[in-house]
Amino acid sequence: MGYPPEPWSLRGRMYVSVWALPVAALPPIPPELASTVRVARIGGRALVGAAWVDYRPGGDLSYRELLAAVLMRQGWRSRVTITHIWVDSPASRDGGRALWGIPKDLAEIELTDTRAAASVGAEATIRGARPWLRLPIGFTCTQELGGRAKTTPVRATARCGPARLRWHLEPDGPLGFLHGRKPLLTLVADDFRMRFGAAPPSP
């Protein structure tokens, strides 16, 4: 096995933007999830997040990532389903797919304090990131794994604050459904400490 067992302990910095989209504009959700989760609607629209993540040394793996995810619901509980995700680490790709059903693919990714780019037709300029308040962060991912819904807890703390990203997305690229759309907000989560996945059961 070329990747760590779960849970993964990760650290780094993340920039995330959030859009409100018509449900019809969403990327496809795996049909295997239809009996478990549904798209969460707020004012008749769906919330989509896209994030650049720099997983830095000090965690179980060090790599860069670009992802898009949709806010879902399971009854009254919120869930997150990742629809698109690229990493520059084969270990992260293989572990994400095998452990949690996260559809990771490989890409060339550049991420600095002022610029982000991925070889899938996605770029962003970064300005005005002001992390200042350390907050707890928690959510639950629901993905398709082996034809069934796989639910995975994610817990973190990070220094959070506003940021400004100008996204440049190719209209015919995999994130083209966000092309030309203005995000509602953008945040930075700096110096995050994340635990991704469930702890193994006690013997």
Language-model segments: which ranges?
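N-terminal domain-onset segments
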Residues: 1-65, 75-80, 92, 180-184, ...
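Short beta-strand element of the conserved SAM-dependent methyltransferase core
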Residues: 15-21, 68-70, 165-169
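Aromatic- and glycine-enriched beta-alpha-beta binding-site module
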Residues: 51-122
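Interaction-surface and assembly-scaffold signal
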Residues: 96-203
